[in-house]
Amino acid sequence: MIQGERLWQRLMELGEVGKQPSGGVTRLSFTAEERRAKDLVASYMREAGLFVYEDAAGNLIGRKEGTNPDATVVLVGSHLDSVYNGGCFDGPLGVLAGVEVVQTMNEHGVVTHHPIEVVAFTDEEGARFRFGMIGSRAMAGTLPPEALECRDAEGISLAEAMKQAGLDPDRLPQAARKPGTVKAYVELHIEQGRVLEETGLPVGIVTGIAGLIWVKFTIEGKAEHAGATPMSLRRDPMAAAAQIIIVIEEEARRTGTTVGTVGQLHVYPGGINVIPERVEFVLDLRDLKAEVRDQVWKAIAVRAETIAKERNVRVTTERLQEMPPVLCSDEVKRAAEAACQKLGYPSFWLPSGAAHDSVQLAPICPIGMIFVRSQDGVSHSPAEWSTKEDCAAGAEVLYHTVWQLAQGE
């Protein structure tokens, strides 16, 4: 029923907003590029017959009324902001597919018991202020006050950026939804991995979203001359760091479900001919089960301490962030499964290793996600790509999922 060509044209048009010479997209929160994106999507929402407004957090919302004005609302959406030099599907697909769903309903005279709201959440990525999911946290009523003091590379705080965008940070609590007012939240998103591609399927149903911990390691040794210091006398924190990173890989692999990554490492003083004095790196550890993730972390910590003693270096750790795993709602999963069956797609289940706005909304409503196949599993890159056909398939599954949720009492 949905018009895949219309969805695709909108994706491509939106992808021009913030486009870089590399072909990637940079569209940070509370910038002129984000404003242009919001205005463009707002025009799509109005074309779809929605009542359009922004809440106190800057979340862009388009509402389709239901037959019962007192019924709880079904939310569908994602985000419009990007990472630096990212792709044009991560976030926008979920928002524009939501618009396509309600526009198709309106064009075919489909009415629902529950109202439906399409939401484009503010600052999911956190690329500008290094604190993400601002809009969804605000809607859930869980945005900590200290987040307003986070600053970008230019020294501008989140509070200042909101004011520059015409928002009042003091009104942020007004964005919070009251308990019991949201029936469910459904998000269509690119997978950002290779599982669907490996299985040859265009869409999949998400079982849950992995919980993560970020742990900063600081390893201190002794800076000495690289040529004049015998190997037997060295207190080399870089060698210890390398050994610990291998331990992380080994312990994560033992479970079959945990993933551990070190994507950031700093070496001091950083001379070619100097044994480092200090090495810092951050561990990203994720699993769908918190107890499994925590067991892996304990094993890593014990082995890291052993390595420190063997190499005569000092290891300290600091937990930077923790996010609990979130399981998707049985009701939303059943609706998505029925949608797949209706459309002739297998019900393929997979977890999400990446965090999404869904995580923040889980405390206030049932949540669910549908994934669309990612070419080569690439995301957060100009090479991010999903085909027109796969995007349309995901939107069709989303349509029938939302319809079923919005029809029920």
Swiss-Prot record:
Consequence when changing residue 225 to A: Loss of activity
Top-level taxonomic group: Bacteria
Keyword Ubl conjugation: no
Record CDD domains: M20_bAS
Region annotation Involved in dimerization: where it falls in the sequence: 208-325
Family: Belongs to the peptidase M20 family.
UniProt protein name: N-carbamoyl-L-amino acid amidohydrolase
Species this chain originates from: Geobacillus stearothermophilus (Bacillus stearothermophilus)
